[in-house]
Amino acid sequence: MKARELFEKLKKELNNFSIYDIMMIRSFIEKDAKYLPPQYKNHYVEAMMKYLIETFNEIRKKSVDEIQDEEIDEEKLNEMLNRIERFRKYYTPDEERFINLSKILCPYLAFIAKKPLHPEYLTFPGNVKIIKKGNNYYCPVKNKQLNEYSLCEFCVCKSIDELK
């Protein structure tokens, strides 16, 4: 599959989301963040919602002609989508909306925009952030989150260890 074809598909699916859906997704993110350390919880929710809305609007405003039409690794794309499906814990309508939007935003970020799956302005526990150096991104938690449920292997970020 080519990047423009994927972008058109993602953009079309994005049109199914309303402000009501975004409000439900925020509710889900707040609920899902309940186990984060209190000092990070509010920041995490705010940063993730800001990035979600920025990415949402970026897709809406971008035209297909702006997309570099390179080949997308469909096997990796399908693995990412399957992992997102496995995020389910609660089987609630707000979680369903979150899953469906993640299946649009994450492939866009990873395969088309080539941006991190978390925003650069998100502070992770330990008071660390993603660092951009030149055209490369370095993540402080990438090596700590590589498991069958994470999306880290699809993210453009390199491990921060590569900076040292």
Curated annotation (Swiss-Prot):
Xref: Pfam families: DUF2115 (PF09888)
What is the native source organism of this protein?
Methanocaldococcus jannaschii (strain ATCC 43067 / DSM 2661 / JAL-1 / JCM 10045 / NBRC 100440) (Methanococcus jannaschii)
Q: What is this protein called?
A: UPF0305 protein MJ0646
Q: Which HAMAP family match?
A: UPF0305
Instruction: Write out the similarity annotation.
Output: Belongs to the UPF0305 family.
- From what superkingdom does this record's organism come? Archaea
Task: Fetch the InterPro entries from UniProt.
Answer: DUF2115
